[in-house]
């Protein structure tokens, strides 16, 4: 059910129900939000970026799409306006119930179901290209083996994401094996910082490599980053997401073909 739409920056946000009884606290509703930039027209199908937030200590709706550390809607507007990315829709569910523990985040989430809900919300304003769906998860969204990006990686639904992006998530052997279960044509990217969170990245890479057969070889990538900002765990999100989207939505490429330093510098003024 579409609940409301609102102007945000240069585009428009559409809020909708998505498993509200399961994911939200009582009296909260409309946990889904889809953002359509002004450059998107209904005439041409566009990519969809699905963003799964991490631990939600303040029980906020729409983290990263209007609440929380930063507003990715504003980032997307900037990236499209300066020609870094093609027009795209950004959509995200919200979880406030049991949202303090990474192991409980996004249990049972179904990508096909969420994409369908987002499509209904933006009907008449945008069309989604099912061949250009990217899923990104921050922090605890990549820790639950039965949920979040790890469940989506193992799923074999109708929507086959072109990329799954782990943004400073859990990184150990189990997570590596879980992400490696993605379809061969789904590219996997992992970004992490070590200022605030030390992880067994070698174990992650080994676990991933034991399961994964890349197609084509070398199409997945893992990158240690040094984000600018007072809180590196959050400051990592925007520049890393931009780099990943640039790689995934461009011609077949590797991150070396994308100037990540330039992207990070351009976004430094936007980091809160």
Regions found by a protein language model. Name each.
Residues 48-52, 89-93, 132-137, 163-167, ...:
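Structural recognition of the beta-strand scaffold that forms the well-ordered cores
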Residues 51-62, 123, 138, 150, ...:
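Cell-envelope and extracellular/periplasmic
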Residues 40, 44, 102-140:
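Gly/Ser-rich "nucleophile elbow"/oxyanion-hole loop immediately N-terminal to the catalytic nucleophile
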Residues 189-272:
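C-terminal catalytic histidine-bearing segment of alpha/beta-hydrolase fold enzymes
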Residues 58-61, 99-102, 143-145, 172-177, ...:
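Extracytoplasmic/secreted cell-surface and envelope-processing proteins
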């Amino acid at each position: 059910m579409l609940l409301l739409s609102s102007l945000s920056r240069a585009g428009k946000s559409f809020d909708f129900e998505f498993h509200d009884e399961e994911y939200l606290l009582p009296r909260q509703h409309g946990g889904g939000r889809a953002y359509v930039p002004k450059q998107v027209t209904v005439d041409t199908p566009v990519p969809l970026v699905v963003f799964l937030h991490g631990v939600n200590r303040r029980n906020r709706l729409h983290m990263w799409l209007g609440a929380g550390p930063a507003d990715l809607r504003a980032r997307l507007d900037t990236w499209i306006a300066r020609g870094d990315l093609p027009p795209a829709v950004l959509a995200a569910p919200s979880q406030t119930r049991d949202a303090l523990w990474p192991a409980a985040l996004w249990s049972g989430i179904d990508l096909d179901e969420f994409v369908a809900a987002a499509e209904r919300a933006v009907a008449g304003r945008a069309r989604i290209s099912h061949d250009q769906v990217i899923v990104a998860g921050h922090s605890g969204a990549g820790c639950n083996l039965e949920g979040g990006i790890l469940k989506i990686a193992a799923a074999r639904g109708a929507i086959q994401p072109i990329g799954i992006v782990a943004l400073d998530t859990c990184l150990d052997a189990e997570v590596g094996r879980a992400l490696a279960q993605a379809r061969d044509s789904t590219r996997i990217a992992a970004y992490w910082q070590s200022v605030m969170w030390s992880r067994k990245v070698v174990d992650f890479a080994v676990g991933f490599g034991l399961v994964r057969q890349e197609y084509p070889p070398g199409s997945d990538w893992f990158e240690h980053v040094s984000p600018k900002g007072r809180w590196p765990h959050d400051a990592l999100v925007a520049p890393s997401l931009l780099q990943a989207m640039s790689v995934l939505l461009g011609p077949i490429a590797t991150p070396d073909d994308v100037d990540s330093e330039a992207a990070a510098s351009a976004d430094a003024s936007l980091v809160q």
